Amino acid sequence: YAPNELKKDYHEYALPFTRGNYAAAFDYVIKKYISDCYQLQFDKGSKYYGVKGGKPAVILLCTHWHDARVVYNESIRKLSDKWGFPLVKFDEQIGFSKTVEHPETHRQTSTLFADDTECIDGVEYGWHPNRGKDCYIQNRMAAVFVAQIQSLVL
């Protein structure tokens, strides 16, 4: 996250983005979505036509499912703070941390719950979580997400 790389207007960004700057890519999408929602007040075919401010832009950001994705997670937290958007903190609530290896496998616990792995700073972590209604991570993430949504609605 480098605030000096974020543009004032989404039109100022050069497309496509590279993976090197998550914050700029998210900033672009956020600004474009908010602008598109705002413009609906002028669209005669929109149900938000004539509504001051257009469609309310509701945005919820999420961290990666575990805490090894430090650059991504830090960037998304800063964007959440900048914009005042709610943040689903999967990395803090998933049930394990990169700071402690699994006591039996002596590997990162995330590898037990992933279909594949990725190497970050020489350490192997789970990359894409197992999918399916009976998979622990999917159920855990769903519970964390639902709890966050309920806290916003109540």
Which sequence ranges carry the predicted segments?
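Alpha-helical cap/lid subdomain in secreted, periplasmic
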Residues: 1-154
